Amino acid sequence: MTIIDFMREKITSYPKISEFLINNDIHIDFTEPEPTNYGLSSNGDRLLKEDLLGVQTRKHNFVLYAIGQSINDYNRLANSNFLYELAHWLEHLQEEEFTMDVNGKDVKTTFIEATTENAMSMGLMGETINDGIMYQIQIYAIYKIESED
């Protein structure tokens, strides 16, 4: 498992995801252009700090793209509320340990927290608003990896 797998599982387990996700599948690095599809894109990983024992604290950046119905204000408000509530839920995730494969070794990893920013509409998916709107939310996952040694 990687931090990408971990966050995909967390987002899929969001209690209200079934209201907006047709087949409970979040694509990786792309999304279908039809409403209600989601894609989780990994935008980089960086080292925040490393202690003397080799324990690394890292930050992984994601963008969740969501294609939502947009026929009327009710749909657009539901989409915006979904992103708002998802952001709040993600920011309240508890620390959790999991095993991550690092260079062929199983390494103890601890998810620390998720933060979110910039939940917004990105534009039309077709020529009219009836074709759906793409929304995005940026997600940052902070996690620790124990030393590989």
Mark where each language-model region is:
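Short, low-order "capping/linker" segments at domain edges
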Residues: 41-43
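Extended compositionally biased segments used for macromolecular assembly or nucleic-acid engagement
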Residues: 35-37
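Charged, amphipathic alpha-helical segments and their flanking helix caps
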Residues: 1-23, 28, 45-149
